C-alpha cells in the first residue's frame, strides 16, 4: 500500500522585495553631503534692530536738545510767538531779592500811561501773567491812568527758578555723569586709585563731599504771601509808585493780602476781580504725571481746560500763549510749588475788618455769566466786605482779555471818584564819587572867593536834590 505524503510549500513572500538602491542614488547622496546647499540668511532682523537702535538714539538726542533749549533763555525767547515777544519788548525787568539767603532774581513789569497820574498796580493770580492784562493796561493808559502789571516770580517772563550751588539734591543720570567727568578733570583719572593705595580705602565720603560742593541745580521758585509781599514792596519802591490803587485778580488776593496789611498807608484803593483763594485754573492737574505732559504739549487739551474752567471768550492764540509761558523755563514746577503755599484758611471778612484795611476804599468786580455757584461766591465776598462797591461784568472768571475795556471803565471810574493821591518822592542819594567832586569844588570855590574871583558853580545839588520833596499829582 502506497503512502502518499504532501510536501509543504514554501511560504510566499507577501512583501515584495525592496528595490536595491541604484548607483546613481549613492552618487547623489554623497555629492549632497560633500557639497551642502548654502541656506539663504534673512536680512530682516538685522535691519529691524538697526532701525530700532537708530530711532531710539534719535529720540534721545532730540529730547536732550529740546530739554536744553527749554532751559536756555535765549533759545526759549526766540521760539516764542510774535505777540509774546512784542509784550516783552514793551516792558522791563527789575532785580528783587525774595529771601536774604538767596541771589536776586528778575521780575518783569509792563506799564502804560504817564507816571504823573494815578497809579494802578495789577497783580495776577497763579497760572496767569501780565500778558493777560496787556489790553487792559493800554486801555487804562488811554484814560489817563498810569497802569503797571507785574509778573510774579515763577510766572510769565519773571524768573521761574534759581540756581542752587551745593547740597545733596537728587539729580538725573546725565547730570551725575557730568559730575563724574568734572571730578576726573579736576583730580585726574587715577586720583581715587592713588587714595585707595595710600589709605587702603576708597575715598567715597570725600568724593560725595566734592560732588555736593560743586553741584549746581535749578530749584523752582515757591511763592507764598510772605514772598509776594517782599516782591511787591521792592517793585513799588524801585519804581517809586506809592501810593497805588491795587487791582487783585483770581488767587492774587491771598498772595498780596500780607503786603496790603503791612503797607496800608501806601494803598489808595483795592479792586478785586473775581478773587478767590483757589485759582480758577485747576493747577493740580499739572502735577499729575502723563496728564501734565499732554496738557502742556498740545494746544487742544489746554484750550479745553481753560474753556471749561476759566474763559470761553479767549482766543486760541491767547490760550496758547499762556500754555507756552507755563511750559517754558520750569514754569509748571514753579506754579505747582506756589500752589502748595497758598493760605487756604484765609478769612476775607477778618482781613477786610482789620485795622488799616477797613479804611481803604474797595471795589468788587464779579462775573455774572460764569455759573450760579460763582455768583453765590461773589455775594459771599460782598457780604464779607460790606463797605465795598459791588459791580458785575459780562465775562467769565478770566475776563481781563475779552472784557478789558469794560474792566478798565469800572476801575478808572472808581479811581476818579477818590481824592487825588499825594505822592512822596525820595530823591536819590548823592553818589560817593560826586560827593568828592562837590567837596573839592566847594573847597576850590572858597579859595577863589577868598581871592576875589567869581566862578559859576556846577549845579550838582540841583541835579540830584538834597532831602525829600512832596509833590501832588
From Swiss-Prot:
User: What InterPro entries does the record point to?
Assistant: AB_hydrolase_1, AB_hydrolase_fold
Pfam families, alphabetized: Abhydrolase_1
Polar residues: compositionally biased ranges = 29-38
Which residue stretches belong to region Disordered? 1-38
One annotated GO biological process: response to auxin
Note the topology in the membrane.
Answer: Single-pass membrane protein
The reply on keyword Nucleotide-binding is: no
- Tissue expr: Most abundant in root tissue, lesser amounts in rosette leaves, stems and flowers and very little in mature siliques.
Which residues fall in a compositionally biased region of kind Acidic residues? 1-10
Q: Where does the AB hydrolase-1 domain start and stop, copy by copy?
A: 119-283
Q: According to its record, what are the GO cellular component terms?
A: endoplasmic reticulum; endoplasmic reticulum membrane; mitochondrion; nucleus; plant-type vacuole
**Mind telling me which SUPFAM superfamilies this protein's record contains?**
alpha/beta-Hydrolases
Give the disruption phenotype, in one or two sentences: Plants show reduced gravitropism, auxin-resistant root growth and AUX1 accumulation in the endoplasmic reticulum.
**Where does the record say this protein resides?**
Endoplasmic reticulum membrane
The record's keywords, sorted A to Z, are:
Endoplasmic reticulum, Membrane, Transmembrane, Transmembrane helix
Query: Where does the chain cross the membrane?
Result: 44-64
The free-text function statement in the UniProt record for this protein reads: Required for the auxin influx facilitator AUX1 polar trafficking and its asymmetric localization within the plasma membrane. Not involved in the PIN proteins localization.
- Its name, as the record gives it, is Protein AUXIN RESPONSE 4
Source organism per entry reads: Arabidopsis thaliana
